[in-house]
Amino acid sequence: MKDRAGCCLIVFILAMAVLFGIINDDKTDIITGLAVGIFLYASAPILVIIFIVLIIICILPDSTNQEPAMKLYIYDHCPFCVRARMIFGLRGLPVEIEVFANDDEAGPTALIGEKVVPILVKPDGTAMDESLDIVRFVDEYAGKERLDDTIRPEIQAWLDKVGKYSSRLTAPRCVQIGLPEFATESARAYYIKKKAAAYGDFAENIARTDEYLAQLHADLPELAALIYSEGHIGERLGYEDIITFPLLRNLTMVKGLQYPEQIRFYVERMAKQSGVPLYYDKAV
């Protein structure tokens, strides 16, 4: 029995020494571990148990502070990028986000072969684009209940209708609210030249804000009637949220916007759930 007790003493003391060295990543702490081991063993068994529990807690990985396994390249204003950002927040997954300058063609081209965002660099180091493909990949990667893939025709029809004029409200404003992709004059000039060709002169669109806002306010009740709850547009969290929230979020940069209560509650709740902030405080 004495031999067995002696062996246990030696094993325990050595274990304490090794654990101290591992935790502190310092060989000099092995001496401290030896001293602690001797003290605990000579004291009471309960102290030994408590110390072992504390050691286990210290060496277990902290799931709340996990390193991002993926990297997402975006523009802050881009609704397709918002789709990709949403799924990480909704699934509670960490992701490193990097914002390209709007006139940076080399960065995205080096990753995916063309100037496009969002771009996701996956855990294996390969890159992928297409916002909904990214959403599906991350949704599967999370290993939780999948998003509802139902998109009601009424939702799609509303998005198509409002999408015909909503960019005339948001495109001229996103270069005015201090977004990182427009930090340089060259990035702003690049965007203005490209988008003015698609949506018309920015100054003219700003001048017609009241007209476009009136049209939007007339269309919003139709969407409000389709919202099931504050937490999701459909019966449960799904792709209707992924394709609708980005447009509603971007419209919050328009000063004078008045959302019906159902939409306002939904937008604010989804911003918190997804971790994608709104633009109310920047509205112009």
Predicted regions and their residues:
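Aromatic-anchored segments of alpha-helical transmembrane domains
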Residues: 15-21
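Interfacial non-cytosolic loop connecting adjacent transmembrane helices
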Residues: 25-41
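GST-like domain detector, emphasizing the conserved glutathione-binding G-site
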Residues: 67-190
